Design a protein with these regions (language model features):
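Membrane engagement elements in two modes
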Residues: 1-45
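Mid-length scaffold segments of soluble, non-membrane domains
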Residues: 51-85
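Terminal connector regions
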Residues: 73-96, 103, 119-142
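Beta-sheet-dominated interaction scaffolds and their linkers
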Residues: 35-63, 104
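Residues at beta-strand starts and edge strands
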Residues: 31, 59-61, 73-77, 109-113, ...
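Buried hydrophobic-core signal for structured, non-transmembrane domains
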Residues: 64-67, 115-117, 132-134
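Generic detector of short, locally flexible boundary/turn motifs and exposed helical patches
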Residues: 28-32, 40-48, 78-84, 99-102
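Intrinsically disordered, low-complexity Pro/Gly/Ser/Thr-rich segments with frequent PxxP/GP/PP motifs
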Residues: 53-54, 59, 70, 96-122
Length: 142
C-alpha cells in the first residue's frame, strides 16, 4: 500500500513539474520572426537583413530592408506591413518603419530602411513563429 502511494505521488510530481516547465517555456522562450519582403508591381530588388530572428519577449529588435530601385527614374511606392499569422497580430508591435507608407525610392543604388519591433511571449494561445512582411506596391498608377 505504501509503495503504491509513493509511485502515485512521484507520478503526480513529475507531471506537475513537466506542466510548469512547459508553461514557463511558452512565456520565456524566444519567438522566431521571419522577415519577408514582396515587390508587387514595382521594380525593386529587396534584401532583408537578417532573414529570420529569434526575439526574446519584450526585447526591441531592429531589422533592415535593403531596397534597390532597378528603374532609371525614381519610383514612388507604398509599403504595407502585415503580421502573420493573422490571429496573432497583437503579439507583435512595430514601433518604427522607415519603409512603411508612401516613399520615393531613388535609382542611385541600394538604400537601407530600418524597422524596429517588439514581440510578446507566445503564452498559452500565442504563436512561437511570426512573419513580418512588407509589401511594396505603386503609390500612383503607372
Amino acid at each position: 500500500m505504501k509503495r503504491t502511494g509513493l509511485w502515485l505521488g512521484l507520478t503526480v510530481a513529475v507531471i506537475a513539474i513537466a506542466v510548469i516547465g512547459f508553461v514557463a517555456y511558452r512565456y520565456l522562450a524566444p519567438v522566431r520572426v521571419d522577415i519577408v519582403a514582396e515587390a508587387d508591381g514595382v521594380p525593386f530588388t529587396i534584401e532583408t537583413i537578417p532573414h529570420s530572428v529569434l526575439a526574446r519577449p519584450g526585447e526591441m529588435i531592429k531589422v533592415v530592408y535593403r531596397i534597390q530601385n532597378d528603374d532609371l527614374l525614381p519610383v514612388s511606392a507604398y509599403g504595407a506591413i502585415t503580421i502573420g499569422p493573422a490571429k496573432n497580430q497583437d503579439q507583435m508591435q512595430v514601433f518604427l518603419s522607415q519603409c512603411g507608407g508612401i516613399n520615393t525610392y531613388q535609382s542611385t543604388g541600394p538604400e537601407d530602411y530600418g524597422v524596429m519591433f517588439r514581440v510578446q511571449p507566445a503564452g498559452l494561445s500565442g504563436s512561437a513563429h511570426l512573419v513580418l512582411k512588407h509589401t511594396f506596391t505603386p503609390s500612383t498608377p503607372r
